[in-house]
């Protein structure tokens, strides 16, 4: 069962990646054939096999020999993992849409409302109505301060604010806080690495969306266990 979930996840993630890349160029992503980004040759089914195609072709285009960007297998591996940890169709769709949000924001510095609407729809089906107040609080516990900061300092984009409001709704306030802390940690580490490697300057904008998505997925999948672990360590005085 895990194998099939991983396979489905990698296939969907491969499509999501193509959708995001072609959306940026305003190209058709539903019916047009996939082609090598360098030579333009139409790819066959073996070339497009998620993960395996990259391994079989040794990371190079079969026709021109140019290297295939690592983004393709990394997205497919991520999709396989997201498929494996999904417990329902709604969760898988939600995870894949979050992946689309992360990729699109990375490429365009924008979070599309249409992607957020899908996450909201799927997230609603995961809410336990017995804890509705918890979920409603989660939708504002981070997003409201972010909104105020966005208006006062322009430190956040409105897409980031909307993403945290939607994520907080299905996470609840505890996991929402955890997800935001994880986002801050991972974002800070990546920013420091980019600065040290001179890949970015102090004035360069770095998209928050991918880190918000990472924190959201971790908090959703492992949040309660991480919170319980933290509480156990705190009571032990560690």
Regions found by a protein language model. Give the residues of each.
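Residue-level signature of transmembrane alpha-helical entry/exit and packing/kink sites
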Residues: 1-6, 72, 76, 91, ...
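Hydrophobic alpha-helical transmembrane segments
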Residues: 1-11, 82-87, 126-131, 215-238
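Membrane-proximal soluble regions of multi-pass membrane proteins
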Residues: 16-71, 208
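Long, charge-rich boundary regions
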Residues: 58, 62-122
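Functional transmembrane core segments of multi-pass inner-membrane proteins
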Residues: 93-192, 196, 229-237
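Interfacial loop-to-transmembrane junctions
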Residues: 193-218
């Amino acid at each position: 069962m895990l194998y099939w979930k991983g396979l489905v996840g990698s296939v969907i993630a491969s499509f999501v990646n193509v959708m995001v890349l072609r959306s940026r160029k305003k190209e058709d992503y539903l019916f047009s054939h996939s082609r090598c980004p360098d030579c333009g040759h139409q790819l066959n089914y073996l070339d497009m096999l998620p993960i395996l195609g990259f391994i079989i072709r040794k990371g190079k285009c079969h026709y021109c020999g140019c290297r295939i960007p690592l983004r393709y297998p990394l997205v497919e591996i991520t999709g396989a993992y997201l498929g494996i940890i999904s417990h329902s169709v709604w969760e898988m769709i939600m995870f894949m849409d979050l992946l689309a949000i992360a990729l699109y924001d990375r490429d365009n510095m924008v979070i599309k409302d249409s992607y957020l609407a899908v996450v909201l729809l799927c997230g609603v089906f995961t809410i336990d109505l017995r804890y509705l107040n918890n979920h409603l609080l989660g939708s504002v516990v981070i997003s409201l301060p972010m909104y105020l900061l966005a208006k006062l300092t322009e430190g956040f984009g409105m897409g980031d604010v909307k993403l945290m409001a939607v994520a907080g709704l299905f996470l609840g306030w505890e996991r929402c806080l955890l997800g935001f802390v994880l986002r801050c940690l991972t974002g800070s580490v990546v920013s420091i690495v980019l600065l040290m490697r001179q890949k970015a300057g102090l004035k360069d904008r770095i998209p928050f969306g991918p880190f918000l998505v990472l924190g959201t997925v971790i908090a959703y999948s492992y949040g309660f266990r991480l919170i319980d672990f933290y509480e156990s360590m705190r009571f032990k005085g560690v």
